[in-house]
UniProtKB/Swiss-Prot annotation:
PANTHER family: ALKALINE PROTEASE 1-RELATED, PEPTIDASE S8. InterPro entries: PCSK9_ProteinaseK-like (IPR034193), Peptidase_S8/S53_dom (IPR000209), Peptidase_S8/S53_dom_sf (IPR036852), Peptidase_S8_His-AS (IPR022398), Peptidase_S8_Ser-AS (IPR023828), Peptidase_S8_subtilisin-like (IPR050131), Peptidase_S8_subtilisin-rel (IPR015500), S8pro/Inhibitor_I9 (IPR010259). GO terms for molecular function: serine-type endopeptidase activity. Its EC number is 3.4.21.-. Keywords: Glycoprotein, Hydrolase, Protease, Secreted, Serine protease, Signal, Virulence, Zymogen. Residues 126-398 form the Peptidase S8 domain. It is found in: Secreted. Glycans are attached at N250, N362. This is Subtilisin-like protease CPC735_015300. Residues 20-116 form a propeptide. Residues 35-115 form the Inhibitor I9 domain.
Length: 398
């Protein structure tokens, strides 16, 4: 009897030791209750992945039926590059059972993701385009090559885009929606970002194709799982259309540091896309947030008109480049314009710059961030501890 009891305890301990880790959230207040993201181990086949999801669905249905709870379970599935996984709403018993699966690498609490904009200031000057095309500050003219991002696709993963805005000249199209059933930009943030990437008047790359991928609602809020779904869709869409090496992604959003979000954007880079990410607006080390903390993406801090770090901008060794991010004029839904500040406004300068250089120099998208850093001007005053002082520049010689 003693032997059997000891053996049972040993097996239970071994099972617990081999269970997939449920990662602790870095910002507990942002956790979405009972919502999780599950990431599979490398090498899990498509067939095994399908069988695992079927097992989870059956098991969870049984658990919830027993408690008279419905409308839970798997909500989104991810399958791109080396990342296979899913997200959904699960009870505690189901998550415990999932963690025991030998196919699961780790589990993460889903959490809220927000915009990285700050404020709107009416009638602010347009200075960003002039700054990124001149070696000295103070020039308002934008000097650029007429290739202007022609043939490059830009995935604007945000609040949606007003694709009918005349300043997009018909180059903006709707891609996918991972947050609600409203295929419009009810917030305005995504339209502003898209305008900086590639609109006729305010865009860095004035001939780029803009693809709206909605992951945040009209309040500017969404979930980590929704953002990952948007990245998943964008990467697969670019690969299916054979444009991954001539495609860019912009992510002017952020949340708590997340292994799953960082894995998703790293997969996008591995697929060949140029990924520009806002550093964040907390005046702290960007190492603490995602996707800004992922080393393989192009993480962008914000500068002001005086070539200084914007007071709100995050900083740190993960920052690759500075770009204009204070009082940036761009598009608003309904055919108008608006002025916004934030690293949300800096990142699309780098998405647009990536598109511009891909078309101009015929480089691959995966080489764009390094090229942007090579061209950068060492002019930022007080960039922050351990942070580059390089400001983006398009290299036209002016």
């Amino acid at each position: 009897m003693g032997f059997i009891k000891t053996l049972s305890l040993s097996l239970a301990a071994a099972s617990a030791a081999n269970a997939a880790k449920i990662l602790s959230p870095s910002r507990p207040d942002d956790v979405i209750p009972n919502q999780y993201i599950v990431v599979m181990k490398d090498g899990v086949s498509g067939e095994a992945f399908g069988s695992h999801r079927a097992w989870v669905s059956d098991m969870h249905h049984t658990n919830l039926t027993r408690r008279a709870l419905l409308n839970h379970g798997i909500k989104k599935t991810y399958d791109f590059m080396r990342m296979k996984g899913y997200s959904g709403v699960f009870d505690r018993d189901t998550i415990k059972d999932i963690s025991q699966s030998p196919d699961v690498a780790f589990i993460e609490h889903d959490h809220v993701v927000r915009l990285t904009e700050l404020v709107e200031q009416p009638d602010a000057p347009t200075w960003g385009l002039g700054r990124v095309s001149h070696q000295e500050p103070g020039n308002m003219d934008y000097v650029y090559d007429d290739t202007a991002g022609d043939g490059v696709w830009a995935y604007d993963i945000d609040t949606g885009v007003d694709i009918e805005h005349p300043d997009f000249e018909g180059r903006a199209v709707w891609g996918s929606n991972h947050v609600d059933d409203d295929d419009t930009d009810g917030n305005g943030h995504g339209t502003h970002v898209g305008g900086t990437i590639g609109s006729l008047t305010y865009g860095v790359a004035k001939k780029v194709r803009i693809i709206a991928v909605k992951v945040l609602d009209a309040r500017g809020s969404g979930s980590n799982s929704g953002v990952i779904a948007g990245i998943d869709w964008s990467v697969n869409h670019a690969m299916e259309n054979n444009v991954a090496e001539r495609a860019v992604i912009n992510l002017s959003l952020g949340g708590a540091r997340s292994d799953t979000t960082n894995m998703a954007v790293a997969n996008a880079v591995q697929a060949g896309l140029h990924v520009a990410v806002a550093a964040g607006n907390d005046n702290e080390d960007a190492e603490n947030s995602s996707p800004a903390s992922e080393p393989t993406v192009c993480t962008v801090a914000a500068s002001n008109i005086n070539d200084q770090k914007a007071s709100f901008s995050n900083f740190g060794s993960v920052v690759d480049i500075y770009a204009p991010g204070e009082e940036i004029l761009s598009l608003a839904p309904g055919g108008g314009t608006q002025t916004l500040s934030g690293t949300s406004m800096a990142a699309p300068h780098i998405a647009g710059m990536g598109a511009y250089l891909i078309a101009l120099e015929n480089i691959t998208a995966s080489a764009a961030c390094d090229r942007i850093k090579e061209l950068g001007l060492e002019v930022i005053n007080n960039p922050g501890a351990g942070t580059t002082n390089k400001l983006t520049y398009n290299g036209n010689g002016q």
